[in-house]
Amino acid sequence: MRIAITGTPGVGKTTISKVLRDRLGIKVIDITEAVKKYKLYTEKDEDMDSYVIDFEKLEKFIDEIEEKEKTIILDGHVSHLLNPDYIIVLRCNPEIIKERLEKRGYKPKKVLENIQAEILDVCLCESKGKVYEIDTTNRDVENIVDEIIEAIKHKKERKGVVDWTEKYFDYLTLEIK
């Protein structure tokens, strides 16, 4: 079983995935790290300081791990595009995402692009199949993990519970060159 933990950078995917791994003993694949470490990309986008993923190579890499593991967690903002059986979409207040990404040293253009992606529900809209959406804003990690475990256990589905468009509409009209 493939469980995708997806969402805009800065929502808490890696933190949540690590706690799930520790509590459930499930193998976690950090998509970003795997892409870099095993060169599962076609090129590096210098302007956005990111990699253009070779999805065919990445899928093959995941298939090999999945043959050995009963269940795996795919941690990454593109994990929902990797044929998961179940998708957890983490959401977070755009202002908090902005702070986190700036602390990580993201370029202003990349920060804005990710804030806009969160406001526009990009990861949620791209997620197909069994999807469960969670707002992580100001929530305890253990509480979030408890909710995820319950959702997976009972195959719960929930979409459209978070909407940042009205409150943060102004971010959508900004442009950084």
UniProtKB/Swiss-Prot annotation:
It catalyses: AMP + ATP = 2 ADP; ATP + H2O = ADP + phosphate + H(+). PANTHER family: ADENYLATE KINASE ISOENZYME 6, POS9-ACTIVATING FACTOR FAP7-RELATED. It comes from the Archaea. Pfam families: AAA_18. Residues 30-53 are annotated as: NMP. The lineage of its organism: Archaea, Methanobacteriati, Methanobacteriota, Methanomada group, Methanococci. Keywords: ATP-binding, Kinase, Nucleotide-binding, Ribosome biogenesis, rRNA processing, Transferase. ATP binds at G10, G12, K13, T14, T15, R104. This is Putative adenylate kinase. Interacts with uS11. Not a structural component of 40S pre-ribosomes, but transiently interacts with them by binding to uS11. Belongs to the adenylate kinase family. AK6 subfamily. InterPro entries: Adenyl_kinase_AK6 (IPR020618), P-loop_NTPase (IPR027417). Its EC number is 2.7.4.3. One of its GO terms (molecular function) is ATP binding. Residues 103-113 are annotated as: LID. Signal peptide: none annotated. One of its GO terms (biological process) is rRNA processing. It comes from Methanocaldococcus jannaschii (strain ATCC 43067 / DSM 2661 / JAL-1 / JCM 10045 / NBRC 100440).
